[in-house]
């Protein structure tokens, strides 16, 4: 009986030690992600980055996204609601991170649309029709182009701008910045430079609310 108690006690100690070790590792990983973001803060926003909301808002959400990403599509209205619910206090900056096969050409179309002043309309159309052009985790640029025909983009300008040094540089810059910030999946969120470590809708809302509290008070 005593032996069983000793064995059980030893097992409990081992499990406890394992849990403590895992918590330490999680804290260390969280610290690494946050320090990486802080050291590379200049990589969060670029001049070409599309922006929505009040330019003077003191809370900034930066989102790295892939238009072929289903989770990005789900979170898009959530982020729009955040801006709507805190008018003038929160702005959104989006960055390209084409991880799905074929997505790089799609984000080039989006950036070409930005040059025509129709980025947000094109993004809305992209998400609304995602199931038609993003199939089995692969983006199909030709199908994408057909899906956004209602936006009214000039196709010749888009075709030319997609291959322009400006658009190619913008897309590559975003990819490089994502790497520098440790973003390897989409959507990747930062709120006032602080990365969203534990992914989820409630976690994002909490991060935004904390920033609102710091910047604007209760």
Language model features by range: what are they?
Residues 43-44, 74, 170:
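Short secondary-structure boundary/capping elements
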Residues 54, 63, 198:
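Conserved strand-loop elements at the edges of beta-sheets that form or border functional pockets
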Residues 46-50, 78-80, 175-177:
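A generic local structural motif
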Residues 1-24, 146-218:
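C-terminal cap of thioredoxin/glutaredoxin-like
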Residues 57, 62-68, 73-149, 154, ...:
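Structural alpha/beta surface segment adjacent to cysteine/selenocysteine redox centers
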Residues 41-59, 84:
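A short beta-strand-turn-helix
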């Amino acid at each position: 009986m005593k032996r069983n108690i000793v064995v059980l006690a030893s097992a409990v100690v081992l499990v406890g030690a394992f849990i403590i070790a895992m918590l330490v590792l999680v804290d260390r990983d969280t610290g690494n992600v946050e320090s990486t973001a802080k050291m590379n803060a200049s990589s969060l926003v670029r001049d070409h980055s599309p922006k929505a909301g009040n330019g003077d808002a003191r809370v900034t959400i930066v989102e790295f996204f892939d238009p072929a990403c289903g989770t990005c599509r789900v979170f898009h209205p959530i982020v729009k609601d955040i801006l709507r619910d805190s008018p003038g206090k929160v702005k959104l900056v989006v960055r390209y991170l084409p991880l799905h096969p074929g997505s790089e050409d799609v984000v080039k179309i989006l950036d070409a649309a930005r040059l025509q002043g129709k980025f947000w309309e094109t993004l809305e159309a992209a998400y609304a029709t995602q199931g038609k052009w993003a199939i089995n985790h692969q983006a199909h640029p030709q199908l994408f182009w057909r899906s956004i025909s209602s936006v009214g983009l000039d196709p010749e300008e888009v075709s030319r701008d997609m291959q322009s040094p400006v658009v190619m540089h913008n897309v590559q810059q975003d990819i490089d910045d994502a790497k520098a910030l440790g973003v390897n999946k989409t959507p990747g969120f930062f709120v006032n430079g602080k990365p969203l470590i534990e992914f989820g809708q409630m976690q994002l809302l909490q991060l935004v609310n904390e920033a609102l509290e710091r910047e604007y008070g209760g």
